[in-house]
């Protein structure tokens, strides 16, 4: 069974598990299935607005697809989420990424 298949099986059993969703998003990014990856990243953010790595990956995905306005917006939301939970390191990292594309 592939890693993707394993994650899908876990997701079927635990559809609210954001960690599994994140794993699925990363798998789909690695196979260049960007639309599916985006769906999982959106699901994570909708379920847990403080899941900071999802913002980072989602913004980077948009940046890599040259959708810079969307990437900027997602970075800003991620910075706010990181600050909300006092994750200063992640906030600073996303601020740096944002500055690079502005």
Region roles according to the model:
Residues 9-10, 43-44, 78:
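Canonical positions in the second alpha-helix
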